[in-house]
Regions:
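C-terminal, non-catalytic tails of nucleotide-sugar-dependent glycosyltransferases
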Residues: 2-71, 249-290, 414, 426-453, ...
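Short, acidic, metal-binding catalytic loop of nucleotide-sugar glycosyltransferases
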Residues: 64-69, 86-98, 144, 311-321
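A conserved hydrophobic helix/loop-capping motif in glycosyltransferases and polysaccharide synthases
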Residues: 72-82, 93, 294-305, 309, ...
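Glycine-rich, basic loop-to-helix element that forms the pyrophosphate-binding segment
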Residues: 105-116, 354-371
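Short aromatic/hydrophobic "clamp" motif used to bind/position activated sugar donors
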Residues: 121, 376
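Conserved donor NDP-sugar-binding/catalytic core segment of glycosyltransferases
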Residues: 129, 133-165, 223, 383-429
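A recurrent flexible, glycine/aromatic-enriched loop bordering the glycosyltransferase active site
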Residues: 164-193, 361-362, 369, 417, ...
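A short, conserved alpha-helix in the catalytic core of glycosyltransferases
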Residues: 194, 204-231, 259, 390-394, ...
């Protein structure tokens, strides 16, 4: 019965995905009719196995759609050289391509395109078919971003019956995610000059060779010059590669070596390792001596939770040095007060009394001047340490000069996922993604198990350098006393030019809102509504277009599922990151 139900659910999902594609195709036809510029001189495709029937079929469809002849640079395998001259759509002077060869392993793509007159090259993996509308979308993207360094697009899987399934809707540029997994695995558009500038690499693994190429092409590029085309422009053939992308595949030695070489080229003091849950884990080196971390823990009564939190920090944390600043917000239970007095015998712990009406932002702000540390850790009193090296992991990331805030992986008491990053726009403002997953569930594209950037993380456990906190003027205690203060802070950190990183390798339990509870009174509901509205007014542009998400993905679901509304969120008639009317 369970298998039947799962099959029915998958069938319904595939049907909704194809209905969604049909809605997008209606707009695409309209967009073609309204196109005012010709794409022909901007269309170059490079495929590493053009004899693959799906690839060949897609190329033939593409030629049929052109309004005038185009040049084509094809990067192919040695074994397909002879068959290229037999492709019927290449016959005749107007459609004669330049073709070049590249070995599937250990070869140099730069050498393969050296003789090409084309400045723009689209790289298409051998197990992919090209969407017929891809040249048009590439041309439009180039017109919008003429100084691009690299472009990439969404992808899906083509079934034998002509249907489509398993959409891979990518997020915006995410440097930390690319260090964890080669998430840009479909159609990639690059400049010929950039390919020619690459040094030849002797890498025996196809997947590692591709990952190395992506890292080299992006590691010196400005973020604004790495462009995501939020449309499905390629279709994977075969389930193996799709399965790898839908979850976090285990990295082999060649892939780990590729990431390590990238870190070395970028002078990043870190070591790459194969992560037990999949992908690559990068351990960032700590400065010597390690900086003092100041843990700020607001609390009120709730002795059991506070004792559990403090005990887990003291008994399990392997990092040193650290201090704990407990902010007592008016505790009046005798057992709690006695416990607070006992804690002061530990030289690492200080108690700060602050009896003002509860204002999470103000309590943390007021505690910062009391901290001696270079690193600030905002820690709820209802968390419990799981991984002993949680602070090593988070401090290592927080001390990176381009990182402004770091979040942890948090689990509910029942061992389901509570926090794996915050996605903007869901529910109107934001929501935790991948909630309620079990430990063995990797999440969409494996992202519940991979270090990556988000626009925001929760302050239930968040680290940042003190200088960054002071630069952005801390929490906004006037506008966001209780709700959204951590999201607002992270967005100001992002606006200041820093990255916000979430790591799955620092794990804690979070017995969520166990001390204060949910918003139940009329006064609490009114306060929440006011803070909700302030977030919408201050950050509406960001809330509607989170770069850690995909503009085709649903704003209703917490699992990265694509939009199944009557019309897709992404528009072809206006800039991609504007919603359709």
């Amino acid at each position: 019965m369970q298998n039947t139900r799962n099959a029915d659910e998958r069938g319904g999902l595939v049907a909704r995905f194809n209905a969604w594609l049909h809605a997008l195709n209606r707009r695409r036809l309209l967009r073609r009719r309204q196109a005012k510029h010709r794409a022909a001189e901007r269309q170059w495709i490079a495929a590493d196995d053009p004899s693959n029937p799906p690839v060949a079929h897609a190329l033939q469809e593409r030629f049929a759609a052109l309004q005038q002849p185009a040049m084509l640079s094809v990067v192919m395998r040695e074994s397909t050289r002879a068959t290229a001259s037999e492709w019927p759509w290449f016959r005749g002077p107007a459609l004669t391509p330049n073709w070049h060869m590249v070995s599937p392993s250990g070869g140099s793509i730069a050498e393969a395109v050296r003789a090409s007159p084309s400045e723009i090259i689209a790289l298409l993996p051998a197990d992919c078919g090209l969407a017929p509308h891809a040249p048009m979308m590439i041309a439009e993207a180039v017109a919008r971003s003429p100084h691009f360094a690299l472009m990439y697009a969404d992808e899906d899987c083509a079934a034998g019956n002509g249907g489509r399934h398993s959409p891979l809707l990518h997020c915006g540029w995410n440097a930390e995610l690319l260090r964890s997994t080669p998430y840009l695995a479909g159609l990639v558009v690059v400049r010929r000059s950039a390919l020619l500038a690459l040094e030849q690499q002797a890498i025996e693994s196809d997947s590692a060779l591709w990952w190395d190429l992506l890292l080299r092409l992006t590691e010196r590029a400005a973020e604004k010059d790495i462009v995501h085309i939020p449309h499905v422009l390629s279709h994977r053939i075969g389930a193996e590669r799709v399965s790898r992308q839908l979850s976090a595949a285990h990295a082999d030695a060649a892939e780990v070596a590729v990431v390590q070489a990238h870190l070395d080229r970028c002078a990043v003091p870190a070591r790459a390792h194969a992560a037990s849950t999949g992908g690559v884990r990068v351990r960032y080196s700590l400065p010597s001596p390690a900086p003092l971390a100041s843990l700020i823990v607001p609390t009120r009564n709730g002795l059991h939770l506070l004792r559990q939190c403090v005990h887990s920090i003291i008994e399990r944390t392997t990092y040193a040095p650290y201090e704990i600043i407990i902010v007592d917000n008016g505790s009046d239970e005798p057992d709690t007060l006695r416990y607070l007095d006992e804690l002061q015998s530990d030289a690492r712990i200080r108690i700060h009394r602050d009896g003002r009406p509860f204002n999470f932002a103000a309590l943390n702000n007021a505690a910062v001047p009391l901290c001696r540390g270079q690193v600030l850790a905002f820690v709820n009193n209802d968390v419990e340490v799981i991984t002993p090296d949680w602070l090593e992991e988070m401090v290592g990331l927080a001390m990176r000069p381009d990182v402004g805030a770091v979040g942890a992986r948090l689990w509910f008491s029942n061992k389901t996922l509570q926090h794996a990053g915050v996605i903007l726009g869901i529910g109107g403002v934001a929501a935790h993604i991948h909630q309620r997953l079990s430990r063995d569930q990797p999440g969409y594209q494996g992202r519940a198990q991979l270090t990556q950037e988000f626009s925001a993380v929760t302050a239930a456990c968040m680290l940042m350098r003190r200088e960054v906190f002071e630069q952005v003027h801390g929490f906004d205690e006037a506008a966001f006393a209780v709700d959204f203060n951590d999201i607002d802070l992270c967005l100001r950190v992002r606006a200041a030019g820093y990255r916000v990183v979430w790591t799955p390798h620092a794990e804690l339990f979070h017995h969520e809102s166990a001390t204060r509870g949910a918003n139940r009174s009329n006064e609490q509901k009114a306060r929440h509504a006011a803070e909700f509205q302030r977030m919408r007014e201050r950050w509406s542009r960001w809330l509607d277009n989170d770069p850690a998400y995909n503009p085709n993905a649903s704003l209703k679901n917490l699992d990265f599922s694509f939009s199944i509304a009557t019309e897709p969120r992404v528009s072809l008639l206006k800039p991609w990151f504007e919603q359709s009317p």
